[in-house]
Amino acid sequence: MPRPISRRSLLMGMSSVSALAMLSGCSSGPRATDRSEQLVWSTYGVGTGTYNDLAAVANTLTGRTGRQIRLMTSDTGIGRLAPLINGTAQYSRAGDEYYYAFEGNDEFTSETWGPQPVRLVWTPPGNYGVLVRKDSGIEKVEDLKGKKYPRLVASTSMNRKLEGILNYGGLTGSDVEFVDISYGGQIEGLKTGQIDALYQNVVGANIEELASQYPVHWLDLGGNDQSKYETWEELAPMVRPGRFVNGAGMDEGESAVNMQYTIPLTTLAERPNDEVTRLATALDENFDYFKSATPDAKNFAFDRILLEPLVVPFHDAMVEFLQQKKRWTPGLQARNDALLERERLMMAEWPGFWEENGDNDNVRTMWVEWKRDNLPALPPINDVPEPSENGGAA
């Protein structure tokens, strides 16, 4: 019987993984012989917590099901999502770009893109926030005033979250010195003093290595003052405050609150239902084989996946899977249906909108304003219980 992947063996194996890596099973098992059984998943760069999680999952599914899975990596949001849209990849774990692509916002407000039929498949929770060195003198968000703050290259979603974190502390972009830097370059930037803070997953090989070299501190985003979060709905509607433990550099028993959201495994609406069902079933049934491979792998458990905030519809096959597993609710169905109708209206409007306004320098703002003025509000979800032991419920 195949053995579960250990975290140590996974990290050792990843040291030689290239940007486009074929992950073969770590043990004996059935093997696919037809190229149609190969899949490509796009995601973050090697060494990030997000990559580590997906490598463990892909390695396990390759070994257990025989379907070969390759990981394609990129350090930018567009670079992670473009392979999904152009057909190079069949699935993507690409950060909040899935939301902006669905909405056709920001970089996706272009002739090349526009609103895209993105669908959720698997939505593990995770915690992300701002980390500083303890010797920086920065103890709370308010202390970031006047400091060198990251502005991540080609990563609109994370920059919006970075703005929301400043707002939590009563600050705006004018209160900090922005430093343009890549997501992957932040750790070295913090070491050298290029930046005074970085935005990262609370776990991952790179961030843990940093914490082993320098005492670090996660800025807390907790408290009962709801006014501190009032800009989050507009800047990052997929986010909620969430408590976490066991983050890089944290002491035993220490906890903090930062941003909790899913970096989901996504696909397009056209992906075959039977394939998505097989994938969801494989993720659920083989969870025990990869759950201890990384600090966050446990969050891939079916009873922990996040169902809200819901800002992009689930794939039809995943809705059926959730129904069969008794986790789907009337509130989720109403929200999902409303998102599908929103998609229909956006796609119907888009060709004419772009033809009329594509040359306008303010086209991004105009598109957001058109949606605000013409699309119905999405219904709230009030009947979804907290995920089981997700380690991040506020």
Predicted features by range, described:
Residues 25-38, 223-224:
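C-terminal segment of N-terminal export signals and the immediately downstream linker at the start
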Residues 32-168, 179, 218:
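Short, glycine-/small- and polar/acidic-enriched structural segments
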Residues 96-98, 105-109, 136, 174, ...:
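Pocket-lining segment of extracytoplasmic ligand-binding domains
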Residues 148-164, 238-306, 310:
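Ligand-binding clefts/hinges and TM-proximal coupling segments of bilobed small-molecule sensing domains
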